A protein has these predicted regions:
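Chitinase-like catalytic core of GlcNAc-active glycosidases
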Residues: 49-221
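Bacterial Sec-dependent N-terminal signal peptides
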Residues: 1-2, 11-49
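Intrinsically disordered, low-complexity Ser/Thr/Pro-rich tracts
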Residues: 2-3, 218
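Gram-negative bacterial Sec-dependent N-terminal signal peptides
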Residues: 6-7
Length: 221
């Protein structure tokens, strides 16, 4: 009888230890699935953004995936233009952000632009384009009689345009925020900023051969 009782107790305890204690996620609120007609209508609406008030966002920190607040999939469908303040996501290092970004672009029609703060003098940024401080001090702020733009304008402009062509995104977001005295005196400020936008406008923007590519300027003086 004692042996039988011990055998029963052993079986009971073995049953408890064999229970699956791994935590399992519960899908308490499944994501709502919209129809293809919904997305087609959404893209058609996004195409009218030049005719109405629009929704523009700067977005960064999308190297995180634990919260929808840090993911492209978490952005509202109503966003017309997303400025990639966190940079262009690497498809190898950050495949989720890359995938969701392009799903947002292609499925929802949300346009993607690359932002940059326009400061060529700050931290000797001009040196990245093979220019010297003397170049910035002495080069003209206007087009020469032959229609040639100054070197700083061409080199910096082409550097920014490269992202548009290489990544296949929708344009540039230029943040005009000249802060240092050097930037205001020798950098891209005032008439030089006007010239810079004019140069870029030959390639992207409403007066260019690529009017679907956006040339956005925001900031302060």
């Amino acid at each position: 009888k004692t042996i039988t009782t011990l055998a029963v107790l052993f079986a009971v305890f073995a049953g408890f230890t064999a229970c699956d204690t791994d935590a399992e996620p519960l899908n308490l609120q499944p994501a709502y699935k919209y129809s293809e007609e919904y997305y087609a209508n959404l893209r058609a609406y996004k195409d009218t953004f030049k005719e109405r008030s629009l929704c523009f966002v700067w977005f960064s920190d999308y190297d995180q995936s634990y919260s929808m607040a840090y993911r492209f999939a978490g952005l509202p469908d109503s966003v017309d233009i997303c400025s990639l303040w966190g940079g262009y996501p690497d498809p190898v290092k950050n495949p989720l952000a890359y995938k969701e970004m392009w799903e947002m672009r292609n499925k929802k029609g949300t346009r993607l632009v690359m932002p940059t703060i326009i400061r060529i003098m700050e931290n000797d940024n001009f040196a990245n384009f093979g220019l010297t401080r003397e170049d910035m001090v002495n080069q003209t702020t206007t087009i020469d009689p032959d229609g040639i733009y100054p070197d700083w304008c061409v080199l910096y402009g082409n550097h920014l345009l490269k992202d548009v062509w290489e990544y296949g995104i929708d344009g540039l977001d230029l943040d005009y925020e000249p802060e240092s005295s050097d930037e205001r005196t020798y950098g891209i400020y005032g008439s030089r900023m006007t010239l810079f936008v004019q140069y870029l406008g030959q390639f992207i923007g409403p007066m260019s051969p690529n009017p679907e590519k956006l040339l956005i300027v925001d900031g302060h003086t």
